[in-house]
Amino acid sequence: MALRVTADVWLARPWQCLHRTRALGTTATLAPKTLKPFEAIPQYSRNKWLKMIQILREQGQENLHLEMHQAFQELGPIFRHSAGGAQIVSVMLPEDAEKLHQVESILPRRMHLEPWVAHRELRGLRRGVFLLNGAEWRFNRLKLNPNVLSPKAVQNFVPMVDEVARDFLEALKKKVRQNARGSLTMDVQQSLFNYTIEASNFALFGERLGLLGHDLNPGSLKFIHALHSMFKSTTQLLFLPRSLTRWTSTQVWKEHFDAWDVISEYANRCIWKVHQELRLGSSQTYSGIVAALITQGALPLDAIKANSMKLTAGSVDTTAIPLVMTLFELARNPDVQQALRQETLAAEASIAANPQKAMSDLPLLRAALKETLRLYPVGGFLERILNSDLVLQNYHVPAGTLVLLYLYSMGRNPAVFPRPERYMPQRWLERKRSFQHLAFGFGVRQCLGRRLAEVEMLLLLHHMLKTFQVETLRQEDVQMAYRFVLMPSSSPVLTFRPIS
C-alpha cells in the first residue's frame, strides 16, 4: 500500500524534511534550450484555512481525488503547490511515471506517514520498510523480498490462500442454502474484509482465525475493530499539523495509539507462537512467511515484527475493496462476467491440481483486476522525493522535490485509456501498456505484499465465478471516498445466485 498524503498545506512536520533533501540530489544532464523553469509550472492554490476547518469537522478529505482530478482538467497534466514552505509537483501521465522510474536510485525516498511514525517513536518500536528510507530500508527490503515477492514465495503460500478462498465459498454456499429464495442478497464488503484478514494471517503466521464463520472469538473481534479504528484515525490525523491536533484531537490520537497497540500485541503473540513452535521442533512443511523469516535468521525478531505489523494492516482494505468493486462491475456487466466464467471453467482442472496456475491460466481475470484498479485505485496516488533534477512535461523539477503521481486521474484520462468510463478488461490484452498499471507502485519500492494480494483476489474470484452468478439492480456508478484509502462511500448490494 502506497503512502497517502494530502496535496495541500496541512501537514507541518513531515513536509519540513523537503528543505533538507534538496542538497542531497545531483544535477541531471542539460535539457533542451526550450526547457521551462520550475516557477513556470502552473500553480494550484486553495483556501488552506477553510480546508483546515473542514478537516476538523471531518468532512474535508473525502473528495481529495475529485479535487485533484478537477485541478488536472483546469491546469493540465502537471501543476505545483506549496505545502509547509516546500513545493510539491503533481503529475498524472504514464510518461512521467516512466521518467520517475528511470531516475530512481537504489534508495528511493518516500514521505513518512506521521501518525504511524509517532506511534513507533512513542512506543520505542522499530519501523518496517513502509516507514523507512535509506540503507536501513534497503537492507530490510532485500531480506524480505525472497520470502514475500519471489516466485518461490508465491509457490509456498498459494495453497494456504486457496484453502481460505475455498472455505469462503463454502460458507457463502451455506448461507445461500439457508435462504428460501435460493439466492442471497447482501453487502459483501465486511465478509470480504474478513476473508482478506483470514487469508493474510494464514499466509503470514500459518494460523487460521476462524473469521469466515458466525461466531468470532473476542480476540479476533478486537483485532478487526483495531484495524478499522487505526485507518479511521489515520485519516483524521494525516492532514493536520501534530502541533494542532495534540490540542484539538487528543481523543483521536489516543484511539490511534490504542489501535496500533492492539495490532502490535497481536503481531507479538503470533510471532511468539511461531518462534516457540520452531524452537520446540522445526516443521518440515512450509508454515508461513514469518516462520520462514525466523528460520533463516536474516532479520532480527523486532524487524520481523515491524514488517509483519505493516503486512497485516496493509493487506486488508487494499485487497477487499478491489474485490468488492470487481464483483460490482461484473454484476452490471454480465457479458464480461460470462467471458470470465468461461475462462475460469476452462482452467479449473489445472488450477485444482496446482493453485499457482491461477497466476498464469487466467489472463482475462488478471486483466479484469487491472481494469478495476484503473477505475478504483485504492492508493489514489504514488509519491517520490527526487534524488536528482528531472524534466517533467518540459519543466525543470529540482532534486528534493516531492512528486505525486495521481493514479485516479491517469485511469480516467481518455488520452491514455479510450472510453475510460467503460469497464473493458480486454483493453489490457490488446497491447502492452507501459507504466499504466501502477496500483502496486513501481520499481524497487513497489508494494511488498503485491503477490499476496494478487493471489488472494485471483483465487477468490476464480472460485466465485465457477460457483455463483453475481447480480445487481444498481447501474449507476459507485461514488468513491478518500478515507486514507479510496473506498466506496456506500458499498453496493449484490445478489449471489448459484450456477446450475
From Swiss-Prot:
It holds the Pfam family p450. The gene is Cyp11b3. GO terms for biological process: adrenal gland development; aldosterone biosynthetic process; C21-steroid hormone biosynthetic process; cellular response to hormone stimulus; cellular response to peptide hormone stimulus; cellular response to potassium ion; cholesterol metabolic process; cortisol biosynthetic process. GO terms for molecular function: corticosterone 18-monooxygenase activity; heme binding; iron ion binding; steroid 11-beta-monooxygenase activity. Residues 1-24 form a transit peptide. Gene3D superfamilies: Cytochrome P450. Keywords: Heme, Iron, Membrane, Metal-binding, Mitochondrion, Monooxygenase, Oxidoreductase, Steroidogenesis, Transit peptide. PROSITE patterns: CYTOCHROME_P450. Belongs to the cytochrome P450 family. This is Cytochrome P450 11B3, mitochondrial. Transmembrane segments: none annotated. InterPro entries: CYP11_CYP27_families, Cyt_P450, Cyt_P450_CS, Cyt_P450_mitochondrial, Cyt_P450_sf. One of its GO terms (cellular component) is mitochondrion. Its cofactor is heme. Heme binds at residue 447. It is found in: Mitochondrion membrane. It comes from the Eukaryota. Its EC number is 1.14.15.4. Its main location: mitochondrion. It catalyses: a steroid + 2 reduced [adrenodoxin] + O2 + 2 H(+) = an 11beta-hydroxysteroid + 2 oxidized [adrenodoxin] + H2O; 21-hydroxyprogesterone + 2 reduced [adrenodoxin] + O2 + 2 H(+) = corticosterone + 2 oxidized [adrenodoxin] + H2O; 21-hydroxyprogesterone + 2 reduced [adrenodoxin] + O2 + 2 H(+) = 18-hydroxy-11-deoxycorticosterone + 2 oxidized [adrenodoxin] + H2O; 21-hydroxyprogesterone + 2 reduced [adrenodoxin] + O2 + 2 H(+) = 19-hydroxy-11-deoxycorticosterone + 2 oxidized [adrenodoxin] + H2O.
